């Protein structure tokens, strides 16, 4: 009989967001007249920028003409898109990234999991706690962990607590770790990292021959000019870091699918024989074998982000969601809740009141005012007693949700 990958059996019964959906669906079936406002999963609500739509429509028309039809594209992505990304997203900020080091993909969620294909099974892996669940679950699936304890912490992972006491920025570990997951602006806490903080991580990685996986999916929400948008703005990062970015949260590509990963050609890791191997070559080989590239139509849409009109439209989208975050922050703070994040980030991290657990607060919020958020405990043990609220929704829904909470929800 065929056998399975038993590592999947170590995972919790359900990924966080499907469990939220299950509870919400059960409530909706029992209460068909309830108007549920979803501020949980970080999916965008506003339409694609006009510049992107126009470019994609034109690309569709090209596909209808033999002279301009496109078949299989380059697995790494079209050069015209990678050049614009390198120039406008990185080099314009002083980050030394070449277009040849950029790989276009269909999502940074996919890439943060798939990147493990090119690393060995014996690495010591560090994650923050709370953390985006994909970082943990993909390592469990790959067999890099033992079983989970009662708090949901997996044996074999190094957890770095982020709390109000350390301003939700993890401290440098005292032990040696090999692979480090960092996400700034942070999901779920909304925390940001200064250049000094990232420099400390880069220095640690250089001293210990570690690799940093830097998730910058929300960098477009940074408005503070002192904060870095890319880890490659930090001296020495090209020797120790891989960066992941996405068009999902700046240009609304959650349903369109386009992202990118940067693997510097100067980045190396050890082979079993002790030799140094360029990770760019391994990732290129992996992508060429397992990935056929993002569609031409979608890449033309992504390219339009870098046009003058596209830049203005994306900026307006980001500002819209940041204004939502500001409303959430101000209303919940006025209601007496302890609130973090929501500045330079689209997520607001809320301390649950009166000692309520994260899931109890979720259920109470859903049942009393029909508002959905994300239980902090779903992001890790240190997230217990917290709750994430997303700014990704319409202005009308955000304002109504906050009105319901402030007027009808008893803290």
From Swiss-Prot:
Keywords: Aminotransferase, Pyridoxal phosphate, Transferase. The keyword Transferase applies. It is an enzyme of class 2 (transferase). Pyridoxal 5'-phosphate binds at residues 72, 108-109, 132, 187, 218, 246-248, 257, 292. Substrate binds at residues 15, 42, 109, 132, 187, 292, 388. The modification N6-(pyridoxal phosphate)lysine is found at residue 249. This is LL-diaminopimelate aminotransferase 1. Its cofactor is pyridoxal 5'-phosphate. It catalyses: (2S,6S)-2,6-diaminopimelate + 2-oxoglutarate = (S)-2,3,4,5-tetrahydrodipicolinate + L-glutamate + H2O + H(+).
